[in-house]
UniProtKB/Swiss-Prot annotation:
Lineage: Eukaryota, Metazoa, Chordata, Craniata, Vertebrata
Any one of the GO CC terms: mitochondrion
Chief location: mitochondrion
Membrane-protein topology: Single-pass membrane protein
UniProt-annotated location(s): Mitochondrion membrane
Full protein name: Protein CEBPZOS
Keyword field: Membrane, Mitochondrion, Transmembrane, Transmembrane helix
Top-level taxon: Eukaryota
Segments traversing the membrane: 15-32
Keyword Transferase on entry: no
Length: 80
């Protein structure tokens, strides 16, 4: 019985591993895009504000302050 489950277990493991890698690379791409583009952050603030909040908190925890304030100032000035 254990022998027949081995190939299934390997397939499941590979599937989980691929899903993890896709998630890590997706998160890196999203962070990179938000970190380099204020316009993208503005789009994220309208569509997915909770994701932008995670970005702001993670950058503040890493010691990079002022991004949130700069964004808010720029967006407020662009409305006027």
């Amino acid at each position: 019985m254990a022998r027949t489950l081995e190939p299934l277990a390997k397939k499941i493991f590979k599937g989980v591993l691929v899903a993890e890698l896709v998630g890590v690379f997706g998160a890196y791409f999203l962070f990179s895009k938000m970190h380099t583009s204020q316009d993208f952050r503005q789009t994220m603030s309208k569509k997915y504000p909770f994701i932008l909040e995670v970005y702001y908190k993670s950058t503040e925890k890493s010691g990079m302050y002022g991004i949130r304030e700069l964004d808010q100032k720029t967006w407020l000035n662009s409305k006027n």
